[in-house]
Amino acid sequence: MPGEVVGCISCIKMNFGVQEGTIPRDFIEYDFAEDALDFETQLAEARDVKFTQVLAEPLSIGSHIVCTGTPSEDLPWFAVNIGMGDPDSGHGDIAVHFNVRLPQRYVVRNTRRHSKWGTEETTAFRLFPFKMDRPFTIEVLVDEKQTLWAVDGEHYCSYAHRQPSPHVATWVQVAGVRNATLNINKTDIYPTMAPPPIEVPLRAFIDAPPEPSEPTCWRANAIATLSNGVPEGHQLVIHGRLRPMLHSFAVDLMDGAREWPAPNVHVHVNVRAHVEPHLPRQLVVLNAWYGAWGLERRQRTARLVPGTQTTFRIIRGAGEWSVYADDSMIGELEFRAAPEGVKALRFRGDLYPEQVYLCPATNSPVREE
């Protein structure tokens, strides 16, 4: 009807206890502009706190950079830069920019060329490891095609070389850390500060209780040793929890318990839940690495439930590795090298292990029809 205002009955009855025309006192007293100005001031101060070391010789495969320091509350971020040109003008090229943003709790990697930044990378193999007022040690390993970054002895991320490459860098710089130190040498292993790997225990059968000598706590994204390998007719069992926001995880059987030099991977099992996640089954990729990746085996066979407990098995057969998840076979990979070469296990990503052990495969699950 013209001239008549009609209101929603439900809206008329709603009463949220807010008086029209008033703003909460806390918002009146909080000066957002001043807070933003303080943050910009802190960023400017962080850029001015620099420690630069000129390289006596170019970085090469095996170059090892160790940076130590302690983040402080008045500097909201810090960075490790590997670059060339004038390091103080702010216009030099940066081959690798490792930017730790403490308020946001993530680390950005990027490259700057001709004053233009590229695409940021933020993914990592572990949770954010830095805290205010807690000392840190960052290790940087320069490889042929990438740099590897470890924090406090644990591998954190990798960053593929862009243009310009760190192999043509002339300096390394730490910005935003007042007590920073830098040490640049060569190494034949990475990370140098890694704790000794845990040995995977052997049990008599799959439901056998753990021995008192077994590890009680398994770290995510860890490497463990298999001193006697995986004997034929035995299986590697990983029981753990899946991340609620399941993205992906990988399990590798390798010929050495190390991150670098890159070990041979006899079997690589990668569950990629993020690829077309609307489909009823997750993508499983199987492969092997002997200096380069071989031919992939790809199939949609996993039906994992995020946030739940799961049991993952890799069984050594007569001529193949068989992979099971929760009593269902999700893939097979033929031997691409002698299986006796397996001496280590590595798991990464969204599978958090609680029990890991070897046992005979006599009670293996059956193939799902």
Language-model segments: residues:
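Peripheral membrane interaction modules
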Residues: 2-137, 141, 145-147, 154-311, ...
